[in-house]
């Protein structure tokens, strides 16, 4: 059995409902519904969720670990939430959050406007910092990757949009 799939999920302040092939996790920050693969059994034991494969096949074993990680992320998301921090490096690079839009000045001849999907919020504590928050880990990471994709860090000066914890290795310029 999968090592990840064996460990139970603690439901710290989250309610879980199992209904016809789907699990709904409800918490103080919102609700996430996730389809459960038929090769995985989910059991709710007062305060913890236990997942187990239906049979001893490799696929069921692998999916039990995957489903456990996805459900654990949903529980974490509805109780504490997820956030991803981005930093803008470069002269004149600025960000401004306006409602569900993120306005970016990234050295192009036009401003870049990124529309935030439902359930995701962007904050700009300073003009060069962006904090993307939400309850769905996958969506938060996807939006952060899309924003970074507008101007990824270049290898010579390091200018561009980077994750706050990202280390950009700079190349040396050509010498004559």
Curated annotation (Swiss-Prot):
The keyword Ribonucleoprotein applies. GO terms for biological process: cytoplasmic translation. Keywords: Ribonucleoprotein, Ribosomal protein, RNA-binding, rRNA-binding. One of its GO terms (molecular function) is structural constituent of ribosome. One of its GO terms (cellular component) is cytosolic large ribosomal subunit. Gene3D superfamilies: Ribosomal protein L6, alpha-beta domain (3.90.930.12). Transmembrane segments: none annotated. InterPro entries: Ribosomal_uL6-like, Ribosomal_uL6-like_a/b-dom_sf, Ribosomal_uL6_a/b-dom, Ribosomal_uL6_bac-type, Ribosomal_uL6_CS. Belongs to the universal ribosomal protein uL6 family. HAMAP family: Ribosomal_uL6_B (MF_01365_B). Part of the 50S ribosomal subunit. NCBIfam families: L6_bact. This protein binds to the 23S rRNA, and is important in its secondary structure. It is located near the subunit interface in the base of the L7/L12 stalk, and near the tRNA binding site of the peptidyltransferase center. This is Large ribosomal subunit protein uL6. It comes from Burkholderia mallei (strain ATCC 23344).
